[in-house]
């Protein structure tokens, strides 16, 4: 995958995360600055998601630790857990919010 394809695919993931947060009506603020998306919760905890262009990866940092995602079979997959990026984002958001979130 070249640089342009990588950015296009990551942009889609970031957009999906934003839309899911909006549709869930959860109290999660998000901001995208450059290559970094910051999710902030009512308790001021944060999840940081950023693109690592040189390695063609998406990295996620939360209170559970740091995770690296590579595109495997058209799915962003964690190198540690095998979990899909979107599923981990949802799981980590619920941990940070300390409540179940109604994901649509």
Swiss-Prot record:
GO terms for cellular component: cytosol. The keyword Cytoplasm does not apply. It comes from the Bacteria. InterPro entries: CyaY (IPR047584), Frataxin/CyaY (IPR002908), Frataxin/CyaY_sf (IPR036524), Frataxin_CS (IPR020895). One of its GO terms (molecular function) is ferrous iron binding. Transmembrane segments: none annotated. Pfam families: Frataxin_Cyay (PF01491). Coiled coil: none annotated. SUPFAM superfamilies: Frataxin/Nqo15-like. Keywords: Iron, Metal-binding. GO terms for biological process: iron-sulfur cluster assembly. Involved in iron-sulfur (Fe-S) cluster assembly. May act as a regulator of Fe-S biogenesis. Belongs to the frataxin family. This is Iron-sulfur cluster assembly protein CyaY. It comes from Vibrio atlanticus (strain LGP32) (Vibrio splendidus (strain Mel32)).
């Amino acid at each position: 995958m070249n640089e342009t394809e990588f950015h296009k695919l990551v942009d889609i993931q970031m957009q999906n995360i934003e839309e899911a947060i909006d549709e869930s009506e959860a109290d999660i603020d998000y901001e995208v600055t450059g290559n970094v998306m910051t999710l902030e919760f009512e308790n001021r905890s944060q999840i940081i998601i950023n693109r690592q262009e040189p390695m063609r990866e998406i990295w996620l940092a939360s209170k559970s630790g740091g995770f690296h995602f590579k595109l495997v079979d058209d799915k962003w997959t964690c190198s540690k857990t095998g979990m899909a990026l979107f599923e981990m984002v949802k799981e980590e958001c619920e941990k940070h919010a300390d409540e179940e979130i109604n994901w649509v």
